[in-house]
Amino acid sequence: MAKAIVSIFVVFFIFFLVISDVPEIEAQGNECLKEYGGDVGFGFCAPRIFPTICYTRCRENKGAKGGRCRWGQGSNVKCLCDFCDDTPQ
């Protein structure tokens, strides 16, 4: 009986260690993306420039891994600095 209780305790203890050591899933959404700031306009995200000025400026000025453009209604465009992914888009 005592061996069974000790065994169960050991199993739970190992399970706890494994769960606490598992790395967290990389941040997504708002934790990764921060707006560059200001009205950057179309020039920051012009589709024919690769990588975009948004990508380059986020890396140089904000210390981010990259930058992404989000297009809204009409000419509304936002530059979001990406602190998790360095893939140019």
UniProtKB/Swiss-Prot annotation:
Changing V6I has the effect of: In strain: cv. Goe-0
Q: Which GO terms describe its molecular function?
A: serine-type endopeptidase inhibitor activity; sodium channel inhibitor activity
Any one Gene Ontology BP term: defense response
Q: Where in the cell is it found?
A: Secreted
UniProt keyword Signal present: yes
Q: What is its main location?
A: secreted
Q: What is the designated name of this protein?
A: Defensin-like protein 195
**Which organism is this entry from?**
Arabidopsis thaliana (Mouse-ear cress)
The top of its lineage is: Eukaryota, Viridiplantae, Streptophyta, Embryophyta, Tracheophyta
